[in-house]
Regions:
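Short intrinsically disordered terminal tails
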Residues: 1, 76, 80-81, 149, ...
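Mixed-charge, Lys/Arg-rich low-complexity intrinsically disordered regions
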Residues: 48-83
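Short, flexible coil/linker elements and helix-boundary hinge sites characteristic
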Residues: 14, 18, 38-39, 78-80, ...
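Short, charge/polar-rich alpha-helical segments
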Residues: 1-25
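Basic/aromatic-rich interaction segments and small domains that mediate binding to polyanionic partners
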Residues: 91-131
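Extended alpha-helical coiled-coil "stalk/arm" regions
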Residues: 16-53
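Intrinsically disordered, low-complexity, charged/polar segments
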Residues: 65-69, 118-157
């Protein structure tokens, strides 16, 4: 699963959760309307509201667990880049080849690489991993994860 697939799966979970929770909220409003129109008693309205609130909480928790499980599965994948890999980056038109010595990560945060003793934050241009093509030559691949954490590039504001 790449980062785009992860984002799509997360969006699908969120969409399903929103649809189900909106339906439950609609049912809660319906109970309130019936109570206001004196179709059902206060006691019955309270009991129905209580039941719907419990269902609402359980649905919300179920989708939160699904999203957390998806996040953990994505993070456990083999990563694109490891210590010792060679990457290159284009910075102001000049390509730089960098060897990764250590990688420090905060979970699902923008990673920081220690390169030749200096700190380099991966902001700005997307970094690429140099790969040796089986038929000879070198080609580049966008880095989507570093030590299992998703990596997207972002310009510092």
């Amino acid at each position: 699963m790449n980062y785009n697939e992860y984002q799509k799966a997360l969006a699908a979970i969120n969409k399903s959760a929103k649809r189900e929770l909106d339906d439950l909220q609609g049912r809660m409003y319906e109970v309130q309307r019936m109570k206001d129109d004196k179709v059902i008693s206060e006691k019955e309205a309270f009991e129905r509201d209580q039941k719907l609130a419990e269902i609402f909480d359980s649905v919300k928790n179920r989708y939160a667990r699904s999203a957390e499980r998806l996040k953990m599965n994505f993070a456990k994948q083999d990563c694109d880049i490891k210590v010792g890999d060679i990457i290159w980056a284009v910075s102001k038109g000049a390509a730089k080849v960098l060897k990764i010595e250590t990688i420090k990560l905060a979970a699902f945060d923008y990673p920081m690489l220690k390169l030749f003793g200096t700190q380099l934050t991966l902001y700005g241009q997307p970094y690429k991993k140099q790969l040796q093509h089986p038929k000879g030559g070198i080609y580049q691949k966008d880095i989507t994860s570093i030590n299992g954490e998703p990596y997207t590039y972002k310009t510092r504001v």
